[in-house]
């Protein structure tokens, strides 16, 4: 607006000067003389007398000046109109740009609501240096959630934070080299843990972290350096640290940039070292199996020998990073040099194992990346975004691999707890400096993620964990058919046993079968062992005892004789004492009256005429 006003004033000043110049007599004379050069014939004429020719010349000059003034007036009017319209348009454009800028600044916090809806923000911390490594410590609270997490930076320091973001410990590890790997495990004491840090210079250090016990401040902790591991002065960067438990003995496995695998004991001495053909990327806990850039391998601690094999379906591409599933140990997810997300199965033991790629998916993602798994989900972080994948249902895993739920920009995640100005400064700083992707978890719901420029944030997952329903059971599974086979075999043999024992010798209602089986047993008794004969005698002894009847003697006798009336020779008269006995007789029959001397003699038939029945038959 100031430039337009200055232009208008300069133009009017030029216009007024031009009019005054034309109206001046000297300029008019010069103009007239140049336009109509008429010689003075009468040189003697007096200068005060004005001739007709001079008046004509003045009239022509005035007419030209009027035309010039008219043209200039029209030009000024046009310029005024244009100048009056231009500020409105400029102001309108500026207002529109400001509105768009305000809308854009407002939409930064609402650009991707997926992250804030699915992950609950817990805390955020700011380091004055670059974070290079994150590890969730094994301390648990009464709810089973992790209490602390440790962050290593580029100057060799370790920061221990509470889950709510409070700084618990700031500790210098005695090595100013950046921390590139970190692992922790519990001590034999409940309130102590050990933290192992691997540095870019190849140094591996052991530290002890002790939290406040009962009677002390529970939110206080002390960290001290225990010592340095032997044989770590080769200068190669430590890329991987893992702890292996054998009973109460712990071994620390370390891998450097060249792929060399070194095993240390708890007292920081070297147990052994071996160099595989491909660099290990991740270890399967408690099985000494690991995935490499080209396949898989296993380590035998006794002989310190390595077995390696290629991964079926990898097709000679190199894996950059791996992470094992949080629920199923045999599953792993990786990112290859071809920009593919792969789903891998690692089965077997250290002597016989097999690696197979189940699925591949091409993605638009730039390296480097960091992978982390929580229950049912996979998270991949690069320098700009975080990608969340669903791996909870078996259908996705068996057919197309992990399914992408949503991506979220790190800038949008930062804007949820930073102001717009601070977030913009962080973004500009990240454009100049490359961000190291960092992410860690407790394999449950707690997530710790580096957001660049020293910011580290913690989140709690609100994602639903889908459990396999009954109708999703794989009916073609071999385990299911094996269970069916076992059930069928059990049913068949149980029915067969019932059919064989249904009419056995214990049945008192088949006298003919009982008599024939007794005769057969007597004839073939010499062919059986002593134990078999004793078992038969015990069975005969049980059958020899007749239980008292609940019916009166008369009714029992009449009922029995009515049956035997059809065949008088089939049964002998039954005495009533066989059905009703006194207490003394019961005592006599259950006492010494029985022949217990070896059970050598064959017992007599219960009824007297059984032999006659056998003869008649």
From Swiss-Prot:
Residues 511-529 have a biased composition (Low complexity). It is found in: Membrane. Residues 34-58, 511-617 are annotated as: Disordered. Residues 43-53, 563-584 have a biased composition (Polar residues). It is a multi-pass membrane protein. SUPFAM superfamilies: WD40 repeat-like. Residues 590-599 have a biased composition (Gly residues). The chain crosses the membrane at residues 10-30, 473-493. Disulfide bonds: none annotated. It comes from the Eukaryota. One of its GO terms (cellular component) is endoplasmic reticulum. Residues 531-543 have a biased composition (Basic and acidic residues). The keyword tRNA processing does not apply. Residues 60-86 form a coiled coil. Keywords: Coiled coil, Membrane, Transmembrane, Transmembrane helix. This is Uncharacterized membrane protein At1g75140. It comes from Arabidopsis thaliana. The lineage of its organism: Eukaryota, Viridiplantae, Streptophyta, Embryophyta, Tracheophyta.
